[in-house]
Amino acid sequence: MSLLTEVETYVLSIVPSGPLKAEIAQRLEDVFAGKNTDLEALTEWLKTRPILSPLTKGILGFVFTLTVPSERGLQRRRFVQNALNGNGDPNNMDRAVKLYRKLKREITFHGAKEIALSYSAGALASCMGLIYNRMGAVTTEVAFGLVCATCEQIADSQHRSHRQMVATTNPLIRHENRMVLASTTAKAMEQMAGSSEQAAEAMEVASQARQMVQAMRAIGTHPSSSAGLKDDLLENLQTYQKRMGVQMQRFK
């Protein structure tokens, strides 16, 4: 796996699924391929994206700044600086300075990542802030190692939280989660269907599913009534894709 592929993998792991994730993935690919060299336009686009947490925006802004060649005098963006200040916690800043001193002696991506993984996400973000604000300089490889370690820490806590929700025995939470997944799947079907004539059927199925979820929420239904909703939708989606000559078996 190449260095940039690894960075893209880690960064995308902390971005919530949805159309925005696909947009961010495309921009990362363009930046890494040298196709997008307007750092100011990129960061302005990033600043106005909804849904993303300030920290995720900060990490993405840091990655864009590391990768896109920019003029010496280009201003640092306030929203990135604020996100990478470790919540203003002096303990985070102290640890960030110690980590920075270690990273300065490191020259490899994997070496930097190993060192960084023993620090908290707050300290890692503060260390990124030091580098972003030009208070410290490390090689690009080392900075990417720091980025990936931060994303791994964040993704680990997101995964723990997700696992707790999936494993919950509370029928109301499970019911709502199934309806949310069905609704999200329906939205994805509508986007994938596009405007072709054959898409009408897929659009109809997706639309009916969303109406059903809205009705179930409006009138209140038994927690078991949502069982299989998403799977039924995915089956419909795969049938539609086969007819269109697309083979995608990895949705489930």
Curated annotation (Swiss-Prot):
A GO molecular function term, named singly, is: structural constituent of virion
Q: Entry's InterPro entries?
A: Flu_matrix_M1, Flu_matrix_M1_C, Flu_matrix_M1_N, Flu_matrix_M1_N_sub1, Flu_matrix_M1_N_sub2, INFV_M1
Protein role:
Plays critical roles in virus replication, from virus entry and uncoating to assembly and budding of the virus particle. M1 binding to ribonucleocapsids (RNPs) in nucleus seems to inhibit viral transcription. Interaction of viral NEP with M1-RNP is thought to promote nuclear export of the complex, which is targeted to the virion assembly site at the apical plasma membrane in polarized epithelial cells. Interactions with NA and HA may bring M1, a non-raft-associated protein, into lipid rafts. Forms a continuous shell on the inner side of the lipid bilayer in virion, where it binds the RNP. Determines the virion's shape: spherical or filamentous. Clinical isolates of influenza are characterized by the presence of significant proportion of filamentous virions, whereas after multiple passage on eggs or cell culture, virions have only spherical morphology. Filamentous virions are thought to be important to infect neighboring cells, and spherical virions more suited to spread through aerosol between hosts organisms.
Query: Where are the annotated segments for RNP-binding?
Result: 165-252
| Sequence motif Nuclear localization signal, location on chain | 101-105
Q: Where is this region: Membrane-binding?
A: 1-164
The record's subunit annotation is: Homodimer and homomultimer. Interacts with NEP. Binds ribonucleocapsid by both interacting with genomic RNA and NP protein. May interact with HA and NA. Cannot bind NP without genomic RNA.
Instruction: Provide this UniProt record's keywords sorted from A to Z.
Output: Host nucleus, Membrane, RNA-binding, Viral matrix protein, Virion
Q: What is the effect of changing residue 231 to N?
A: In strain: Isolate A/Philippines/2/82/BS
Protein's name according to its UniProt entry: Matrix protein 1
Q: What is the effect of changing residue 41 to V?
A: In strain: Isolate A/Philippines/2/82/BS and Isolate mouse-adapted
Membrane topology term reads: Peripheral membrane protein
**Other remarks?**
Most abundant protein in virion. When expressed alone can form virus-like particles in transfected cells.
The protein's location, in the record's own words, is: Virion membrane; Host nucleus
Pfam families hit by this protein: Flu_M1, Flu_M1_C
Q: Which GO terms describe its biological process?
A: viral budding from plasma membrane
Q: Which GO terms describe its cellular component?
A: host cell nucleus; membrane; virion membrane
Q: Which family does it belong to?
A: Belongs to the influenza viruses Matrix protein M1 family.
